[in-house]
Amino acid sequence: MARLNINPTRMEMTRLKKLLKTATRGHKLLKDKLDELMKQFLEIVRENKRLREEAENALDTAYKNFIIARAVMSQEYLGSALMMPKQSVSVDVSTRNIMSVDVPVFDFKTENNQSDIYPYGLAFTSGELDSAMEAFSDAMQPLLRLAESEKSAQLLAQEIEKTRRRVNALENVMIPNYIETIKYIAMKLEENERASTTRLMKVKDMVLKKALEEKKKNDLVV
């Protein structure tokens, strides 16, 4: 806490009181924003955990089935089966606003029938490969949601840190400095007022003393 280097005048004190009022109001608004950001961030983190588990389970199932398929199928047939993908996908990217933070929204679309996920005929492939392809397809949506969630959490964390720095600056530096300076100016003004009153009383005493002396002289002459 440090006092601002300004002239201790009533005008400056009035100006500082206005700044203090603005800073206090800004601190409350930023504190409310920080609380809401933290709430949104924690909700995204919880959703992130759920999506990660969902994606990991789907991928785990896909990998296990793929390993079995690779064991029971020849490498030639397996490579041929996966060489030409039959279904095409696209991802549209947009944004949504959370407390003045633009976070991404990923929209996953398939251009063919969702059920048409097998890029091969069924004559020379195993059921495990079908299960693996289905599991990989099922994992796409939670993986995309997971990427969206993690990026949103990252952006909110950055905004939280920036807002927290501003709250701390107001709370620990600016507002205390304004208060300290206002107290200092009030003290100096009070000192000046006391000094001015003392001077006036001294002048009054001198005037009275001089008047009494003049009266005594006049009385002696009479």
Swiss-Prot record:
Xref: InterPro entries: V_ATPase_D
MF (Gene Ontology): ATP binding; proton-transporting ATP synthase activity, rotational mechanism; proton-transporting ATPase activity, rotational mechanism
Keywords, alphabetical: ATP synthesis, Hydrogen ion transport, Ion transport, Transport
Biological process (GO), any one: proton motive force-driven plasma membrane ATP synthesis
Annotated TM spans: none
Domain of life, per lineage: Bacteria
Gene3D superfamilies: 1.10.287.3240
UniProt-listed HAMAP family: ATP_synth_D_arch (MF_00271)
Annotated NCBIfam families: PRK00373.1-2 (NF001543), V_ATPase_subD (TIGR00309)
Function statement: Produces ATP from ADP in the presence of a proton gradient across the membrane.
Family: Belongs to the V-ATPase D subunit family.
PANTHER family registered for this protein in UniProt: V-TYPE ATP SYNTHASE SUBUNIT D
The protein's name in its UniProt record: V-type ATP synthase subunit D
Organism: Clostridioides difficile (strain 630) (Peptoclostridium difficile)
